[in-house]
Amino acid sequence: MVNNVLSRLPTAEAPGPMASLSPARRLLCSRAFLPFLALFVFFYYAALLTNGDFILWAPAIHPGDSEQSVFGFVYNNTLLHLLRGDFTIDIDAIGFEALIRDGKAYTYFGVMPAVLRLPLLPFVDLARIDVAPLSCCIAASLATLLKVSALRTACTASTARLRSDVLVWALLATFVLGGSSVPFLRATVYQEAILWEGVFASAFVVLALRGLTARDGFSPRILVLMTIAAGCCLLTRVVMATGLYAGILALLVWQFGGEIVRNSRDAPAGPSHARRGAGFRMPSTGRFIAPLIILAVFASAAGFINYQRFGHPLAFANFSVQTHLPTSHGVHLAGLPALEEYGEFHPRRIPYGLMYYFAPVWFVHSDNGGFLFDDYRKKIDLIEPPPSSFVVTDPLLLMLAAAGFGALCRRNRMALSRPAAALIAAGLALPPVLLLMAFAMAFRYRMEFYPLFVFLTLIGAFGIKPEIAAPRPRSTLGLVLFAMVGIVASHLVLAIYKISPWGDLNPGDDLWEIYQTGIRRFLTRRL
């Protein structure tokens, strides 16, 4: 009976004949599925983001503060200034994150989340109304729906249909309720930038998978859309955009070289000058020119904004002129010695970065009264709580991503184009590597890892040849258990994140006491 009902559902286009798909996959591809999922995701995320209040916009109570978000007026103020041709920002909106140059306040936050507020201008007084919670909720919802779309593309490919439906549902639950989405649901300007970055990176991953699974490969339309996603990301957060730019440029070079090789093979035998005149054809440059122009336009826009803000087209920020004013959040940094000595990125920080993101014991006190690994800690200016590990919040993704990485490294295992997938994965790996070397390590920077994890996960789960055994865990119990552990851990981490202190911990701080106090305060307000 269930099969009969599912077979009557209206369906959207999916790779291959729908009749050959399992009932679960047909449900995932039905036209009604994504709209219903979108409603659930938006309201569930809104509840988590606002602690159940569902206040997604609010008027300012103090200058630049609605008390519903942190620095919620930064992008409002940025847009209002941009509409006047002004690249400065009001100090009330940006607070201690202000970068002071020639007596004027600037921000290092990208302009794209501000530009995305343009449709609200006729209806909302952005000078008075904080819409940051709404923007965060929309961005988180879009990113999740794009990840589900990527799952749908991967699991319905002709070479992936023998993989278990339980694997499909476990990944669906993980993408919607797990570590790549839920832990970031906090209304701050930092989260808003990260969440919109996640939207553009997720769109890039979806398009990459469509190019890998489509019969005609990476069509001109897919390449153009991938460059637009990379360009929008560049105007949001440059670290993630670095990976997207690297991935799409490598893909274009590979395709261009492939066309040259194919045209050379098709040319008739004979002297080289005769081949050039008679049979040899230069690649069709039209499909490459449009993506390159789009990338150049976005890069030029970013360079122009940087020049107006910091006096140099390649300077996305200048933290040496940051105010670091003490605020109610208790954030105060006494200079940036590690930045000055080692720069923004340095390979000596990689061991500490791996520990911070995968085995977080950095908050444990040592015998001398400081923290563990203080020698490494001196190379970093900001180490932000809460402690969290991908191993706990994303066990299923890590297992499948490892399988995907193994498939890319070994010959004759990929059902998809191995060179193209490897180039995309290499581009997506660049942001995590940069973050492991960064002068600041923060919980929100985990977002930079997820596009790579999601892409490798879907390659490992559905991109391997069907005759090769599915990656572990293979049992229903194992898949469900890994997914549930990640989902529960992600919600717990979000709760801890919301009560975590801002900025660096002092040696005398005890995280356990801080969290106990935070829980008591939260319960007192609620009860």
Annotate each PLM feature.
Residues M1-D65, S69-V70, L162-A170, G279-I294, ...:
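Start-transfer (signal-anchor) and selected internal transmembrane alpha helices
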Residues I100-I138, T156-R161, P183-A187, D375-S388:
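Juxtamembrane segments of multi-pass membrane glycosylation machinery
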Residues D130-R161, A203-L207, A402:
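Transmembrane-helix motifs of polytopic, lipid-linked glycan transferases
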Residues K147-G179, V199, R215-I222, V261-S264, ...:
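Transmembrane-helix signature of polytopic, membrane-embedded enzymes
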Residues W196-D216, L225-A230, L244-G247, L252-W254, ...:
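Specific aromatic-rich, kink-prone transmembrane helix
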Residues I222-R237, L244, L295-F304:
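Membrane-interface alpha helices of multi-pass inner-membrane proteins
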Residues G243-A296, A407-R411:
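Perimembrane helix-loop-helix junctions
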Residues L249, R377-L382, P386-R418, T457:
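Hydrophobic, aromatic-rich transmembrane alpha-helices
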